[in-house]
Curated annotation (Swiss-Prot):
The protein, known as: UPF0316 protein LA_0606
Protein family membership: Belongs to the UPF0316 family.
Provenance organism: Leptospira interrogans serogroup Icterohaemorrhagiae serovar Lai (strain 56601)
Signal peptide extent: none
GO cellular component: plasma membrane
One Pfam family named in its UniProt record: DUF2179
Length: 199
């Protein structure tokens, strides 16, 4: 028994294999494109350029197959479906990768100092300042952190004040990477006291 790959003109190739190839290729190139655009906003130019090359290469291969099969409606559906699916998957991948840094801003009328202390103890570098809201004085707490650590930081904040007001913004560029994964201010103070006692 001989086995051969279906050639163009074969119904299995035209209506099953080719649309599946177009769909999967389109999912891949659109997912890459979504991540590439986000990387550009994060100043990751080298990686974005490399992904752009791969994205366009896949697109050329796919569009060539679509043009060769203009009478095949399944190719159109696969192309459009792959675009929609690729956009969705690209956004999920970007969230999972959590590339770059974010600015976390917390506004609290009563617990700002405690929130700042807890974040500092956990190793986040924190800036706190006084402000005035529509209902009176508030404390404004700022910290720049890796996006993948936002959930961890928010758990600390909400343990102190569950209904605290906060906002998260994209920190497009920072001038240092040492503001994270370093001892917090309170922890550092404790270490300094221990060293002084030993001396």
């Amino acid at each position: 028994m001989e086995f051969s790959f279906p050639l163009p003109g074969n119904p299995i190739f035209d209506y099953v294999l080719l649309p599946c190839f177009i769909f999967l290729s389109r999912v891949t190139d659109v997912s890459i494109g979504t991540i590439r655009v986000i990387l550009l906003t994060r100043e990751k130019k080298g990686i974005a350029a490399s992904l752009g090359f791969l994205e366009v290469l896949l697109w050329v291969v796919v569009i060539t197959q679509v043009i060769k099969n203009l009478n095949n409606v399944f190719c159109y559906l696969a192309y459009a479906g792959g675009f929609a699916t690729g956009t969705f998957i690209g956004m999920i991948l970007e969230e999972k990768l959590a590339i770059g840094f974010s600015l976390l801003r917390i506004i609290s009328p009563q617990n700002g100092s405690e929130i700042a202390d807890k974040l500092s103890e956990a190793g986040y570098r924190v800036t706190i300042m006084n402000g005035h809201g529509s209902r009176g004085p508030v404390k404004i707490v700022f910290t720049v952190l890796k996006r993948k650590k936002i959930d961890q930081a928010m758990k600390i904040v909400q343990n102190v004040e569950p209904d605290v007001f906060y906002s998260i913004e994209n920190a497009r560029r920072t001038n240092t990477t040492t503001f994270e994964d370093s001892p917090g201010l309170l922890r550092r103070g404790i270490l300094e006291k221990i060293l002084k006692i030993r001396k």
